[in-house]
Curated annotation (Swiss-Prot):
GO terms for cellular component: membrane. The chain crosses the membrane at residues 9-29, 32-52, 100-120, 127-147. Almost completely overlaps SUE1. This is Putative uncharacterized protein YPR150W. Keywords: Membrane, Transmembrane, Transmembrane helix.
Amino acid sequence: MRNRAIKSFSICICQIFIIYFIFFLLLCVNRICSALSNGFNFLIIYGGTFFHSGKYSIPILDVDHQLNGNSSLGTVGLYFHVPFTPPDIIPPVPRSPNNMFLCFFSSIVFASAFVFSFIVNNVCKDFLFLSLNSGFSFTGYITGLYPLYRISRVSSLASKYCVVGTLGSDLKS
């Protein structure tokens, strides 16, 4: 029984490192593509609010800004952004069971990324585009770190797409 618990814990640790590795690969790809004529980038939507830096150069994560108005705090979506396309014109992602693995995997990735960002925020902030300020609390992230198998309606804009992860609870009334 003890050996089984140790083995399970080891597998869990390995999975976390694999997730971090994939996250950093995505980050590197994003940075390289941004430098090369704003190629394919990753776009994060928080309750229908787009965050971007430069001319359609979009980092993987950018939570340095306060969310506007009646957005749903804590809801994260992962999308591909076509170069030189305005951020508000994005092909919708079909809501189908085929996306459930993407929803689950993205939830794990972003949850791990935010916890990791809490540790390295002051060291690598400029490189990672990660921050836990602007009204977000670390407690909110911890209580909201759970895999998500549902598609959340977060706003009239974001509800058109597949929301693939949730960090924290929706605060939209």
